[in-house]
Amino acid sequence: MYIKQVTDNKETWWGYLLTTFLIVPIAVILFSIPHGVILTSKAFGDEELMAKIASGDMAAMMSILEPNLNLFLMLLPFVGMLLAVFFSTKIIHKNTIRELTTSREKIDWSRVFFAFGLWGSISATMIFLDYNFFTPENYEWNLNLGPFLILFAIVILLLPIQTSAEEYFFRGYLMQGIGVISGNRWLPLIVTSLAFGLMHYANPEIAKFGNVVYVFYI
């Protein structure tokens, strides 16, 4: 039902290709420019540091700016991605955000908050047990209220946008697009799951815990 509800707009199949290979990349690049400009201005005159930035050395990039500013700038491209997906959904395909989100008549926010509460409770319980019973030496109380409040604001405002951008693009927009173009039910699920997993290949948890972590992405 989720894919079927948008198959009436098959004539806009080209929009899925245009969005995937042009509109989304351009939006991500545009929203990445502030980070690049600030990094370059900070490293200007230091040839070694500039070379590291040009090579994509994440450690070097992270060392240049204040951590909260770095996080804010790194999350900005996801704002561009989400806006691009919404733009294409509304303007090119003439679909609604509700149709991109669910096959139900309206978005069921109670399910969203239930899932958030469930995983939040599981995570909090695991951290509590780990801190109190298993490896308390891995934790250190180091509260600096000013930076913490800034970090809290960034996390509350931008992390939901990051996760929504990824999910809407891969599990929503691409899944519907591949379904519309291929007319197949299984192909969209397989392709988007693999693509979502590969996108997270460079994540640090993959290097630390191994490829088994892919299960959580796929």
Language model region names:
Residues 210-218:
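Functionally important transmembrane alpha-helices
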Residues 1-96:
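N-terminal, membrane-interfacial amphipathic/helix-forming hydrophobic leader that caps
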Residues 165-191:
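Membrane-interface helix/loop boundary segments of multi-pass membrane proteins
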Residues 116-129, 160:
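Mid-bilayer segments of alpha-helical transmembrane spans in multi-pass integral membrane proteins
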Residues 91-117, 136-140:
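Hydrophobic transmembrane alpha-helix segments characteristic of membrane transport
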Residues 143-153, 182-190:
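Membrane-interfacial loop-to-helix junctions in multi-pass transporters
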Residues 188-201:
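Small-polar-interrupted transmembrane alpha-helices in polytopic inner-membrane proteins
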Residues 134-141, 200-209:
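Membrane-interface helix caps and helix-loop-helix hairpins in membrane proteins
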